[in-house]
Amino acid sequence: MSASSTSSSSTSCPEGGEPSGSCKSSDEGESTLKKRMQQYGIASGYANSSISTLDRSQYQSLPLNGTRRVTVQFGRMKIVVPWKESDQTVGQLADAALLRYKKARGMANEDRIHVHRLECASDGGILDMDDVLEEVFDLNYDQILAITDEANGGSTTPTYSQIQKQQHHYAQPLPYARKFDGGPSTPIASAFGSVTVNHQAHRAASPYNVGFARSNSRDFAPQPTHSKERRDSVVEVSSFDQIPQSGLRVSTPKPSRQSEDVIDGKPMNQPILRSSLRTEASGSRTEEATPVKQSRVTLSPEVEKKLAEQDERKSERRKHYDKNPGRFARGSDRKSRITDALLDARDRIADQLESQNPAEETKSQMIRVKIDQGPMPGTSLVTFPPIPEKSENEKQLGIEVNAVFDESSELPGTSEPTKLSSVQIMKIEDGGRIAKDGRIRVGDCIVAIDGKPVDQMSIIRVRASISDLAAVTSRPVTLIINRSLESFLEQESSAKPIQSALQQANTQYIGHTTVVELIKSSNGFGFTVTGRETAKGERLFYIGTVKPYGVALGHLKSGDRLLEINGTPTGQWTQSEIVEKLKETMVGEKIKFLVSRVSQSAIMSTSASSENKENEETLKVVEEEKIPQKLPLPALMTPPVPKDTPALSPSGASRFEIVIPFINGSSSAGLGVSLKARVSKKSNGSKVDCGIFIKNVMHGGAAFKEGGLRVDDRIVGVEDIDLEPLDNREAQAALAKKLKEVGMISSNVRLTISRYNECNPGQISRDLSRITVDASSPSPSSRMSSHTAPDSLLPSPATRGTSSSGADSSHSRQSSASSAVPAVPARLTERDSIVSDGTSRNDESELPDSADPFNREGLGRKSLSEKRGMGAAADPQHIKLFQDIKHQRQNSAPTSSTQKRSKSQPRSSSQRNYRSPMKLVDLPTTAAASASTNSQNLDDSDMLNRRSQSMESINRPVESILRGTGQIPTGSSSKVQFMQAASPDQHPFPPGAALLRLKNEESRSRDKSRRKSMGNPFSAMRNFFGFGSKSRDASPEKTPTESVQLRSVERPKSIIDERNNGSSERAPPPLPPHQSQRRGSGGNVFVDYGEPYGLIPQYPHNTTSGYESYADSELYDRYAAHRYHPRGGPIIDEDEYIYRQQSTSGNSPINTSSYVNYGLPASNAYHVGSRIPPQTSSGSISKTSGAMRRVYPAEYDEDVAYHQQIPQQSTRYQQGSGSGRGNADYHHMFNSWFAYTGGGAVGAAPVIKSSYGSSPVRIAAASAIERGESFVVEPVSGSSASATDRRGRSTSSGAVASGSSSTGFQYAAKEKYADARSGKFNGGSTRLFIPRHGGGLSAAAFATNFGGEAYETRGGGAGGSPSQYRRRDQGPPHRFPQY
């Protein structure tokens, strides 16, 4: 019940005049309302008329005559209650209105009509029955709603529970604006919704419908009643069971007021709407004195169809009850829990509940909206048909929506909303158009509203558009839901209980049928049979279970219906007879089974077609009364094809397009599917690519959220690219490339899918073939033979995926997991069975080895973590440069031979002695003196077999070093020799040996840890980018080519060969001391460019870890300070020069030994080049004050013996008679210089100063070196004066006494450059090479031609001194000397 309260009063003031003092009452007992009205009193011509609360402009004046009234409306009847006292309560108003309503209805006072409560329409506030009305209710600007019910149901006034269910969500009741401009007020939705049959009476009186009611004063003017209005009266159908066929006769109550019948010039009562059929007590209207007349009833086709179906069901029930009077009789129907009687009883109970609940019945009889396929795949188009005039609530959709934002493609993963993509339904209100349809669910997303895309609007505009749809009644309105059309069909069966496969297939309908021939094995057929009887007495038999390793596995399924066995229908047998017949079958005997399979989707489409005829075709299922034996599958059993199903291809597969939106708008995560490639192998052995198929849809991926892809779907196109004519490799490449391109410009991708026409994965597909199963063994891989037969339809499930290229082909499926694109690196095959047509074929085919497109490192095959830069793709080990470095390191580890040594190969002698403080080589003891030159031919790389002793062991005696390492046992002779048998007083590193510095143990462990860290990607990354410690293979000077290939270094030609144009053959060079086997090759010493970290390319097999340069050349001062024991003499004094007594030989002239620094001199003797002690003929030592300590070189008999065999070399080798300088140890001098330059910086070469010259000879003359020039000093005949250097220090005759008896050359103090080809200065030359420096440290090579040209001693006369190695006297100690 709604009560619209208005109040009116009269005043004695003139019309249109201002209130005067006489008009004001001085009575203090008047109510506050009367006082307010007197204050604003204005004369009005509507003193005794009803003023509607819809138009606030009507309140121009309020008569203050002390009389007011409240109009209370009960349905279509309005009751006027006089309101005189100002202190009356709300309960008194309710009682007075109810009393007058009963009296007008002719009801007795004892008839129960209960008023629950009164509410304010503006804010829904509940009025207390004991409160004074004027204190809690605004009579001018508010309205009272009375919530009532009637015991006999005769009133159409809604109950409170109905109103609560039908409250509109969007617009809550709001008070009207207090303005008197006559403009339209804000429309507010009605709280009554679509509850009553006649809503037009409420629409005019309710403030919620102001937007649809006109606010003119003529709306309420008295108008005559026409007969047309009476003919359009409301027709109410109280029962569907007894509907008169000749039309309905209705009684129209006489209106109590003219304003009740006509509002806005239109009749208030409208024709019946099928959405508001209600049972209303028509007896209450028949009591009226108004004469009745005929009215025509118009029912929609949907309602007529529903009524016809109800009549048909009732007639069937009556026949059934006549046949079976007991509902749950213990008969044949009780053998199974799921019987027709039980289902019919459930339907009857449901019908009774629906009849008891009119609201649910009305909901079930509502016209459903039309749902079609949307414009985009995965969407549905919902069309709301135009509706006649209804109440406001029936026009509203009745939904609450919330915004769904699309994340920015530039910032994937961000949570900041950027663009509105759709709106999601959060709540569905009862009574709205969507709630009455019932198929749109909470959570569905709306992407378009009446043709307007949501992504082009704001959320406020979207909500306004949804509200504006209520005003559109002349045309249909549409919504596009982001949900596939199939989901609406599946929703119909969602409320049904979950049933097993047998329960789902337990039906009388005949589905897809096939003939299966099984050969019985020793374990039977491998399935069980279950059966039931219908209410008509029919016997139905089904496949109960299929054993895992039985014959029927893969051919029969639980729930399949057995129609025939060997052509005999099973309906004439009992279950025990069928089981007995199967048991009587002999092993190896063949039996034909005609089975039928019904899918759940077909059942759902059948039920959906009865309720939504516009959306899909009615599924026609024909039940066979008797199946012919000769025709196991009649044409009537062809499965139905829905009207909206895409066109079928010749191979029986449907093609359609689907749009898959990427997750977060980016294609980096892929589609979320794993793909497989199928290859068909023909009987002739050829292979045919069958395309790319969906293997699995990953949970949570883009394809999973879209819901349109299924397993075994074939991808035949992507965007505008057709993949069908391409092979598997080309299709994979095209798909990956297109996905990458589309991901950059779009947030979704369009795929073209080909799908076989199957209802579910387990359905038996149709084909023109019979199946023969040879089940001689229970092995799951049974043999099948295919027979071409026109009267059979279905192949084996094993051959279901055969391509259209040939019926005799079988598939081998190549599969691999991927998040975006297909890849088949592993050749996986699925072996279904061996299919033969007379020729044995193996279906385990593989992709060609040459075509391996499904590569893990292929495009699009990387996981999300790898693409984000923290996976294997960002590992430096995958970078080509890093792989080259790693390959270089693995191949640059030196071994004992040029071949790579495996783990099983023994270590070389140099590797076994790695931990020793110095390098020793085990050689057989041979007599060097008796060996010939040709038989003692050693390789040049033998000089690299040695390593220098550590810095700590340099100052130790040789014996202690050797015995400390255990290589020279105590009291036994040593078998370990330094290239030759050496006496104990010889230095372990004699002249002529290469100086290789031993790496310490710490660096070795570091290298070992670096090799271990190669497997760690973070360590590898750190080392690769230079954050970690350097590896010995990471030297920038060492190119990968040098580490793999062994470069051949062309030895420089001899200067004498260039001068003589190769006319004379040079003799081999003199052997170094202690190395009579040292050299037998052609005569030149070539340059060795050492590497600071790696091996020497020329000698990769003679060292295990290469050089290790020292940080500072000053470390070699200790090496220079070390004193070697002379062969023949002891150390006389520390402050004296150390020299030795030369041993003499009868065949060789042995003179006074020359002396040379075996290392760097002490720092205080750097520039004391003139303090050279005199040397007597007797070999005694003359003491000189402040003289620099030097070491005399050893003179070896082997050298003399060697040069006696080479007469042409003796003269040049021994420069002058009696001079020991000819046998000077230049090898050891080179080692000293080598050690010095190896520890210095770039250009830290020493200065070679001749004892006979006045100026030093710099080895840094790069230009002269490149031109082949050398530094020579020309002798001056007859000159005996002592030469001086640049600083004026005396260097005469190499510090040999002037009275020396030894003979030698005398030189002038003049230095010049001489061309090496000119042959000046005794035809000799000295050629120097610039050392190659790497990383500031390098091993330099100083080569002197001592083949055809002997060494230049640069000494003069007997007792003359050889060259001296010294530092430069000026400039930085580690800088290259500058000119």
From Swiss-Prot:
Compositional bias (Basic and acidic residues) at which positions? Answer: 302-315, 322-335, 828-844, 854-869, 1030-1040, 1048-1060
Q: In which tissues is it expressed?
A: Asymmetrically distributed at the periphery of the zygote and in dividing blastomeres of the germline lineage. Coexpressed with par-6; patchy expression observed at the periphery after completion of meiosis I and in meiosis II. On completion of metaphase II, expression is restricted to the anterior 85% of embryo length; this decreases to 55% in embryos between prophase and telophase of the first mitosis. During the first cleavage, expression is detected in the advancing furrow.
- Is the keyword Transcription regulation assigned to this protein? no
Q: Where is this region: Disordered?
A: 1-32, 208-335, 767-873, 887-918, 949-1085, 1273-1301, 1350-1379
Q: Cite a GO CC annotation.
A: adherens junction
User: Which Gene3D superfamilies does this UniProt record tie to the protein?
Assistant: 2.30.42.10, Phosphatidylinositol 3-kinase Catalytic Subunit, Chain A, domain 1
Q: Name one GO molecular function term.
A: phosphatidylinositol binding
From the Swiss-Prot or TrEMBL record, state where the protein is found.
Cytoplasm
Task: Enumerate the spans annotated as PDZ domain.
Answer: 381-483, 515-599, 659-750
Look up the domain of life of the source. Eukaryota
InterPro entries reported for this sequence: PAR3 (IPR052213), Par3/HAL_N (IPR021922), PDZ (IPR001478), PDZ_sf (IPR036034)
Keyword entries, A-Z: Cell adhesion, Cell cycle, Cell division, Coiled coil, Cytoplasm, Developmental protein, Differentiation, Fertilization, Gastrulation, Gonadal differentiation, Repeat
Q: Where is the composition biased (Low complexity)?
A: 1-23, 776-786, 798-826, 894-912, 1290-1301
Q: From start to end residue, where is composition biased (Polar residues)?
A: 239-256, 272-284, 967-977
The answer to whether the entry has keyword Cell division is yes
| Coiled-coil zones | 606-626
Q: Name one GO biological process term.
A: polarity specification of anterior/posterior axis
Q: What interactions and quaternary structure are annotated? A: Required, together with pkc-3, for the localization of par-6; par-6 is involved in localizing/maintaining par-3 at the cell periphery. Interacts with par-6 and pkc-3 for localization at the periphery of anterior cortex of the embryo.
User: Which function does this protein serve?
Assistant: In cooperation with pkc-3, required for establishing cell polarity and regulating spindle orientation in the early embryo. Localization is crucial for recruiting par-6 and pkc-3 to the peripheral apical cortex and restricting par-2 to basolateral surfaces. Necessary for apicobasal and anterior-posterior asymmetries associated with cell adhesion and gastrulation during the first few cycles of embryogenesis, and also for epithelial cell polarity in the distal spermatheca. Regulates the asymmetric localization of csnk-1, ppk-1 and gpr-1/2 during the first embryonic division.
| Family indicated by similarity | Belongs to the PAR3 family.
Which protein is depicted? Answer: Partitioning defective protein 3
